[in-house]
Design a protein with these regions (language model features):
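Glycine-rich, highly charged phosphate/nucleotide-binding loops
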Residues: 50-63
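Glycine-rich adenosine-cofactor-binding loop
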Residues: 8-22
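Radical SAM enzyme [4Fe-4S]-AdoMet core and its adjacent flexible, acidic
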Residues: 113-142, 146, 155-159, 254, ...
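A short beta-strand-loop structural module common to alpha/beta enzyme folds
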Residues: 32-44
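Core AdoMet radical
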Residues: 227-237, 248-275, 286-302, 314-331, ...
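A general structural detector for well-ordered alpha-helical segments in enzyme core domains, enriched
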Residues: 23, 91-95, 278-281, 307, ...
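A short, Lys/Arg-enriched amphipathic alpha-helix followed by its capping loop at the start of a domain
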Residues: 22-31
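Flexible mid-to-C-terminal extensions adjoining Fe-S/redox cofactors in radical SAM and related proteins
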Residues: 116-235, 241-264, 485-511
């Protein structure tokens, strides 16, 4: 690198010791150049010298814009302990892969720090079954254990974790995965990857947990004796009735479905029952890295209060704690408890702009949701948005992402396709293609689209590809959707035309 060149260094500078800042300055001095400091503005004028950007504070889109102004790019390949979080470490690794694939030259200093992620990436490409979850995660329902929430079929039954490592059910799954044999419980990830999706839960979480646990190879799995990740779902008690959900995760939906005396409707809805669960007594605190509490709606469940008070009284508050919530009702008592957890983050379920969100997630009050999220942010708790893409919101996906940019700036968006009744509420069923294409064009100009969440970008691109093709929607499924949706509207006393008129106008395609 020459003295008169413009050099950009990439690193995580959010840790207390400002490691990236210090190292960039050192490299500039070694190359007899000038250290110009950190870039915080994409419009900043650039002259010869060494600059660095913080991989935490700037989005992928912003960094890509900045890179165009430089002669060379240097990755400050920090060891994982120098990153603010393992997620930033893995996101950086993915970003560098994208840069190289796009033709950017990236000069890497001491690349061995990230080489082990290449190992796991290669393994996942060769072994289409392998996933780290059976070695790191516990999801329990009344002593029944599942592999993850994408698969509710139990693999074993355990009343405590003493035999977790050698449990026959887990052992069968682990051995099959090591041999590359497909697992019946894991079809959700297989289906995603079958259409070219390389950001399935299997792929994403394996890379993430390899980083979190500093696993260098598959040979180290034999040393894992207890799970590091516990997912707790105390009950299906909930305070709203989401159209893309089922009675399994909302007792109100379960109650509503039971009251609808319509044989055709009953053949459509998911009837899987929720078993009451605890699970927190199984946690092995010596090894814990992450706990996720979902529902139902976590904030209306007394077990969440009990669990948090138990953690506080036992001084177990430093783990990575995630709570899934619809954000509608959060009590002052909960806000007081939240203050004790410094690594607490929230996953907010939100499916549209306020009016659309209130229709899809029936019982939601958008103003209360927004106020509660601002209060959480003021407490210093990061918020991620959990968005379910469906026929209800695909026609104005652009407006929705613009709203997210404005109302929740900087919050990552975890985008998923509908799971329950997914075939009849699919985002690929909207028959007026021009409406969707126009909205997709808006979506591709948002910060959300250019964020570091690969899954979000992939899903938007896949929808764009479908609606730009000559493929037709499945009108039989569309007809079934209107029947399903009309039944819910009739029970709830609302009308689709008052909330999503462009979808109501599509009724003409099936009548």
């Amino acid at each position: 690198m020459k003295r008169d060149e413009k050099i950009l260094c990439l690193g995580d500078n959010s840790s207390n010791d400002a490691w990236a800042h210090t190292l960039t300055k050192k490299i500039a001095e070694e190359n007899e150049s000038i250290f110009r400091g950190q870039i915080n503005d994409v419009n900043q004028d650039i002259v010869a010298g060494y600059y660095h950007v913080d991989l935490v504070t700037l989005s992928e889109r912003e960094i890509l814009s900045i890179i165009q102004k430089f002669d060379d790019v240097v990755l400050l390949d920090q060891s994982i302990d120098k990153y603010s979080h393992a997620h930033v470490f893995t996101s950086t690794w993915k970003f560098i892969k994208h840069l190289k694939q796009a033709g950017h030259h990236v000069h890497v200093i001491n690349s061995k720090n990230m080489d082990f992620l290449d190992y796991w990436d290669d393994l996942l490409k060769k072994n289409k079954s392998f996933c780290l979850y059976p070695w790191v995660k516990s999801v329990s329902y009344d002593d029944h254990h599942t592999l993850c929430t994408q698969s509710m079929t139990p693999v074993t039954k355990l009343s405590d974790m003493k035999n977790w490592k050698d449990d026959p059910g887990y052992t069968v799954v682990r051995n099959k995965m090591l041999k590359g044999q497909k697992i019946p419980n894991c079809t959700a990830c297989y289906d995603q990857e079958a259409v070219g999706e390389n950001v399935s839960i299997r792929r994403h979480e394996t890379i993430e947990w390899a980083a979190l646990l500093h696993l260098k190879s598959i040979n180290e799995l034999k040393d894992i004796t207890s799970p590091s990740y516990f997912e707790l779902r105390f009950s299906n008690k909930c305070n709203i009735t989401c159209r893309s959900c089922s009675g399994h995760f909302s007792h109100l939906i379960q109650k509503e479905n039971d009251q609808i005396k319509d044989e055709k409707f009953q053949t459509i809805v998911d009837k899987q029952a929720f078993s009451s669960t605890g699970g927190d007594e199984l946690i092995q605190w010596d090894n814990i890295k992450r706990v996720y509490v979902g529902g139902g709606e976590s904030t209306v469940q007394p077990e969440l209060y009990r669990f948090m008070r138990k953690c506080i009284s036992n001084n177990n508050t430093d783990f990575e704690f995630r709570i899934g919530t619809n954000g509608v009702r959060i009590s002052d008592k909960l806000f007081d408890l939240f203050k004790h957890f410094k690594n607490l983050t929230f996953s907010l379920s939100i499916d549209g702009t306020p009016k659309v969100d209130e229709y899809i997630r029936w019982g939601t009050e958008a103003n209360d949701k927004y106020s509660n999220m601002q209060r959480l942010k003021n407490q210093g708790h990061p918020i991620a948005l959990n968005f379910v893409m469906s026929i209800w919101n695909i026609s104005h996906i652009g407006e929705i992402l613009q709203y997210f940019d404005k109302a929740y700036p900087g919050s990552p968006v975890h985008m998923n396709k509908a799971g329950y009744n997914g075939d009849i509420i699919s985002p690929f069923l909207f028959p007026d293609k021009d409406v969707v294409k126009e909205s997709i064009a808006k979506a591709k100009k948002t910060q959300v689209y250019f964020s570091n969440e690969q899954r979000t970008k992939f899903l938007i691109d896949s929808v764009d590809k479908f609606y730009s093709s000559d493929k037709s929607v499945d009108f039989e499924k569309l007809k079934k959707f209107f029947y399903y949706n009309d039944t819910l509207d009739r029970v709830r006393g609302v009308a689709l035309k008052d909330y999503i008129p462009e979808l109501e106008r599509c009724r003409k395609f099936v009548t």
